Amino acid sequence: MASVRAAAVAGMFYPADPRSLNAELDELLGGIDAPAPRLGFPKALVVPHAGYLYSGPVAARAFEELGAARGIVRRVVLLGPVHRVPVRGLAVPTVDAFATPLGNIALDHAALASARELPHVVASDLAHLQEHALEVQLPFLQRQLGEFSLAPFAVGDATVAEVAQVIERLWGGPETLIVISTDLSHYQPYARACEIDRATLTRIASFATNLDHHEACGATPLNGFLAAARERRLSIKLLAACNSGDTAGGKGQVVGYSSFALYEPGAELSLEEAGRTLLAIARAAIEARLFGAAQAIDAPWLRQAGATFVTLTRDGALRGCIGSLQAERSLGTDVAENAIAAAFRDPRFPAVTPAEWPGVRLEVSLLSAAKPMRFADEEDLLAQLRPGEDGVILEHEGRRATYLPQVWESINDKRQFLRELARKAGLPDGVRLARCTILRYRVTKWTE
């Protein structure tokens, strides 16, 4: 029978009820205004570990960076400081899985066995039993990654080199994500905490490896990780920072929070290069149908999940447009399939012919994840819309339609934009927009 570490702080640091937890994750992740679509994802995150009421928004900003990692990251190496049980070195559990209200996460016993070959890595279920620093990250990871295995380390008294050695051993490839759990300064007055934390953020961004526990409670795992990251020449990006006085606490004694994303060299693909590749995939897919087999185009970043629209024009007029609103296929596959559908299966147009093909031009739009809009009434909805930036999905009574941001070029009035979108969805002219579900997204587009 499998042994499972039960969730220790569900109901305290985050909701114990699965439905309530999912709703809170929706709120935290949905509260990040629809970001631009991402190509690639971080190798590592640094995230805080207080209750979601306090540090949840800062943590969510980091986990939002994993939007393209689902289906690629299969293992998470998670390190955080011990708060309850003293440990010499790094402690790993012996149980088979960690539980959260969202389900069980299997442990990667091969990875943990490899780490235990090092003399400073010990087995201790007790060190993990009540530890919150690791547990609070798990629901975010489950939401963003889906299925993955976990290699958790409760870090006690260890040197920079000892922590770095463990991280190096489990570094892996794109299938492995490293997460470091740490808060910043503790129990300082608000102004003093801001001063201390600003200096600490600068030191983290410069890969300092001598942070102390007054600067970051997780200084021990963080220092070791920064040493490994510096050796591998990762780039680092500060995503968010605040303290409990900015969220749900008073300003007399506060705790600081920050989140960082770190990228391996070459992981952040240039938009220009990505656009050339996606347009080439779209054109090759259509030409393969028109003229025969074409050479396949592949790259690791094309295997991430992606949602795209492919638009065909001829002599400046629309010739076909088909796309995906959710990232359910690999990016390369999604572009190719949508290109074929736009050329041959758009019901508004006849199939593209070889004779007209030389005059057809392509546009590929890469969509961010759609975020639900929250509004009090129709006027509030209209006030929030951003012409030229927002792609909009309108849903009501089982009907749905979308307009890409490009449509603002021809319909620049907000109310008319939504009315035309409702009409596209097959809704009556008098439908009350405030009763519709409205989501928005952003796109990055490339045109031949």
What are these regions (language model features)?
Residues F140, P152, Y257-S259, I281, ...:
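Conserved hydrophobic/aromatic beta-strand scaffold that supports enzyme active sites
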Residues E175, R233, V254-S259, G359-R361, ...:
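Active-site lining segments that contact anionic ligands and/or coordinate catalytic metals
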Residues A191-C194, K251, A369-M373:
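Short glycine/threonine-rich loop-to-helix capping motif typified by GTGT followed
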Residues D197, D246-A261:
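Conserved, well-ordered active-site substructure
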Residues I236-G249, L418-G430:
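Low-complexity, intrinsically disordered Gly/Pro/Thr-rich segments
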